[in-house]
Amino acid sequence: MTAVGAREVYQLFRDVALQQKTLRPDVGPHWRDVDTGSVWVRIDQHRIALFKDAGRLHHCLRCELDDGRVAEQQAWDSPGTDPLELLSVWERTQLLRALAG
């Protein structure tokens, strides 16, 4: 099974920004209820854990794709390789709106 690349996860976030896919809360606390900690979301059947630090979207902790592939934060440990870092300012703003919604 091939690894989950940062670009593959970025594309999910981008599709949410472009309103081509829907982001919804998964198990656990909702985005608005967490100041610092992890929040699970779903994009289609993919599960993604995001880390929020002092109220701000910080990094991607884990991604579980619907085909069974999984990537942990360590997969994107090098600078500039976290899927969230690949988002443009506009895409990130749209993602944050979807998280808050």
Segments and roles (model prediction):
Residues M1-D44, V70-V89:
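Negatively charged, low-complexity tracts enriched in Asp/Glu with abundant Ser/Thr
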Residues L18, G55, R97-G101:
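Short, intrinsically disordered, mixed-charge
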Residues I48-D82:
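Intrinsically disordered, low-complexity regulatory segments enriched in Ser/Thr/Pro
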Residues E85-A100:
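Helix-rich interaction surfaces within compact, conserved domain-sized segments
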